[in-house]
Amino acid sequence: MQQLNPSEISEIIKGRIEKLDVTSQARNEGTVVSVSDGIVRIHGLADVMYGEMIEFPGGVYGMALNLEQDSVGAVVLGAYTTLAEGMSAKCTGRILEVPVGKELLGRVVDALGNPVDGKGPLGNTETDAVEKVAPGVIWRKSVDQPVQTGYKAVDAMIPVGRGQRELIIGDRQIGKTALAIDAIINQKDSGIFCVYVAIGQKQSTIANVVRKLEENGALANTIIVAASASESAALQFLAPYSGCTMGEFFRDRGEDALIVYDDLSKQAVAYRQISLLLRRPPGREAYPGDVFYLHSRLLERASRVSEEYVEKFTNGAVTGKTGSLTALPIIETQAGDVSAFVPTNVISITDGQIFLESAMFNSGIRPAVNAGVSVSRVGGAAQTKIIKKLSGGIRTALAQYRELAAFAQFASDLDEATRKQLEHGQRVTELMKQKQYAPMSIADMSLSLYAAERGFLTDIEITKIGSFEQALIAFFNRDHADLMAKINVKGDFNDEIDAGLKAGIEKFKATQTW
């Protein structure tokens, strides 16, 4: 038996050690101290960024939100049932990113951009940061192009422009979502891409929205981001930012996009839940101190950007085109209280609001837009010329009607002028009614407004206004298709169009029935 010399053994071991290739890897790791209600406290992590992704065993990720002296508070993105005390937590050095691009059009994704519609993976997509800084003052352009919602009451009295933030506010179940969905449906041929963000809604409601968009041919140019009521508060809080990043993809490349946040009240509630679980001090209505910043940093990202911005962003690939992201945030009020904390915050951030009223909705006026308190601060400059020209008297007529209607309840004998004003107001109110999922073209809308503005409705019974309008539009689209096409393309109002509309309505009233 051969004897091994100890010195030979040590030489062999030394040789092996020298040849061993070990690369040292510095890792920032900590230990999970507590897990409860989707909030994880981690001890031992150093150099963590606010909003940084933290990796836990089993492919679970969290987001650092509280950076304290000796621990980090993180919110778990998704299920946290597999996490336990004593587990390791690693910094990734990355912030949260979601997929962006045209591959998402027609798809339903969650707050992290994962498809949830059963149509397979998204394919090759770019990713972009969820939290981004809004474009600066120098890169912005004034709002001067319209977004047609297809609603007479909105496009005539509270016009929305590309790059505007227009709040839709009102109590529950009075048509806020219906208004936003119809605005999306109306964009199917306008070249505007749409993003619908559902926050804290029932899954059956989201499924119904998807079905309606598909039935009306608008799903193909819409991205739906769904963070339903069954999702964690963290995902409901993140969903609007994810949707905004997806919309910014189009804005930054010289396209136009429209985003609907349905609704930001539920996002504020989710953020309040996260903040209270992170032991942050509560303020008014138990919301944290930065709830204004929660919404302002989101809504400031909706803007119209200049040609220079688009050219710089695309490295010269796109020139001479402006981009826009128009936001329609929705806020739910309690018993019409617009002076609550979150509604007042969002009203002060946005460029106007469409106020929907329960009393009007219950009396059959739908959409229940209260023209008196609704306003569009920048949309007037973007309004289509013909609509602007014909809608001047509509808002005044409605405002005077509401004032006189209250007065007329107490007065028995009214003079002729007051009676005419009341009757005109009633007819205009009736004309502003519109069915759901039936957005109107510019020409159809112009025709209705022209009939009201020029007194062609004076001899029509109030109960017959709706059927008169439908028959009139059908008649014009059949017998005066060229005139309607010209209005739709140009949107101008001149003597020729004035004469054409007048002659057509006179002929219709003389020869047709309704």
From Swiss-Prot:
SUPFAM superfamilies (alphabetical): C-terminal domain of alpha and beta subunits of F1 ATP synthase, N-terminal domain of alpha and beta subunits of F1 ATP synthase, P-loop containing nucleoside triphosphate hydrolases
Subcellular location(s) of the protein: Cell inner membrane
Record membrane topology: Peripheral membrane protein
Residues bound to ATP: 170-177
Its EC number(s): 7.1.2.2
Entries under Pfam families matching the protein: ATP-synt_ab, ATP-synt_ab_C, ATP-synt_ab_N
Molecular function terms from GO: ADP binding; ATP binding; proton-transporting ATP synthase activity, rotational mechanism
Any Gene Ontology CC annotation: plasma membrane
InterPro entries in UniProt: ATP_synth_asu-like_sf, ATP_synth_asu_C, ATP_synth_asu_C_sf, ATP_synth_F1_a_nt-bd_dom, ATP_synth_F1_asu, ATPase_a/bsu_AS, ATPase_F1/V1/A1_a/bsu_N, ATPase_F1/V1/A1_a/bsu_N_sf
UniProtKB keywords: ATP synthesis, ATP-binding, Cell inner membrane, Cell membrane, CF(1), Hydrogen ion transport, Ion transport, Membrane, Nucleotide-binding, Translocase, Transport
Site annotation Required for activity: residues: 374
Catalytic activity: ATP + H2O + 4 H(+)(in) = ADP + phosphate + 5 H(+)(out)
Family of this protein: Belongs to the ATPase alpha/beta chains family.
PANTHER family (alphabetical): ATP SYNTHASE SUBUNIT ALPHA, MITOCHONDRIAL (PTHR48082:SF2)
Function: Produces ATP from ADP in the presence of a proton gradient across the membrane. The alpha chain is a regulatory subunit.
Quaternary structure annotation from Swiss-Prot or TrEMBL: F-type ATPases have 2 components, CF(1) - the catalytic core - and CF(0) - the membrane proton channel. CF(1) has five subunits: alpha(3), beta(3), gamma(1), delta(1), epsilon(1). CF(0) has three main subunits: a(1), b(2) and c(9-12). The alpha and beta chains form an alternating ring which encloses part of the gamma chain. CF(1) is attached to CF(0) by a central stalk formed by the gamma and epsilon chains, while a peripheral stalk is formed by the delta and b chains.
Designated name of the protein: ATP synthase subunit alpha
Organism: Pseudomonas fluorescens (strain Pf0-1)
